[in-house]
């Protein structure tokens, strides 16, 4: 997609797919610029319910979502430049994204999104649990922000031990996880 800034070039060999994620038939790899059209579609998929209620023509909705994706992509690359920008694949098809920034005190899940057909199958849970194990080993906690209206995601995060940390009345809630014994 022309006009969008590229993903940072990675010098490492690539991420290791957590065993539980692999057992579910998925794998992780670094996002590339060639993924941008599919990531744009993924973004639109994650906001489909929200935008369905808006009385706009289909082309106006798509234009809005494309623009929102571009703004989000630019924001992530500027504010989380050192994050791991990973895509979740199944049978070679991009099915999701997992953007994770390692911190000194806490790791931040910048974004975790899966296409509708892959939600509720344990993939997100397996990704987060693997990240929690890694963070705990390093003595770090984890933080994420969830859309207030995304009750299913909030419930998952609560089951994984995340607790509400901040509610400023906006569209997102901050949730934190502390490693056991921390």
For each feature predicted by the language model, list its residue ranges.
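Acetyl-CoA-dependent GNAT
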Residues: 3-15, 21-26, 30-34, 41-110, ...
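Short helix-adjacent coil turns
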Residues: 34-35, 122
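Amphipathic alpha-helical recognition patches that constitute DNA-binding helices
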Residues: 38, 108, 126, 141, ...
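Conserved beta-strand-loop-alpha-helix junction that forms the acyl-donor binding cleft
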Residues: 115, 119, 144-154, 170-180
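Conserved acetyl-CoA-binding loop-helix of GNAT-fold acetyltransferases
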Residues: 120-133, 155-159
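Conserved GNAT acetyl-CoA-binding A-motif
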Residues: 135-145
């Amino acid at each position: 997609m022309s006009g969008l800034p590229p993903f940072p070039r990675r010098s490492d060999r690539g991420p290791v797919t957590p065993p539980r994620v692999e057992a579910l038939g998925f794998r992780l790899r670094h996002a590339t610029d060639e993924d941008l059209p599919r990531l744009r579609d993924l973004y639109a998929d994650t906001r489909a319910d929200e935008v369905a209620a808006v009385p706009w023509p289909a082309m106006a909705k798509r234009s809005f979502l494309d623009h929102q994706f571009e703004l989000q992509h630019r924001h992530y690359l500027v504010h989380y430049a050192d994050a791991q920008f990973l895509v979740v694949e199944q049978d070679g098809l991009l099915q999701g994204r997992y953007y994770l920034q390692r911190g000194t005190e806490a790791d931040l899940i910048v974004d975790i999104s899966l296409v509708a057909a892959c939600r509720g199958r344990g993939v997100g849970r397996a990704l987060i649990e693997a990240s929690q194990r890694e963070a705990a080993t390093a003595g770090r906690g984890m933080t994420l922000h969830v859309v207030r209206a995304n009750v299913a995601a909030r419930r998952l995060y609560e089951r994984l031990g995340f607790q509400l940390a901040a509610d400023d009345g906006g569209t997102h809630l901050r949730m934190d996880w502390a490693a056991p014994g921390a």
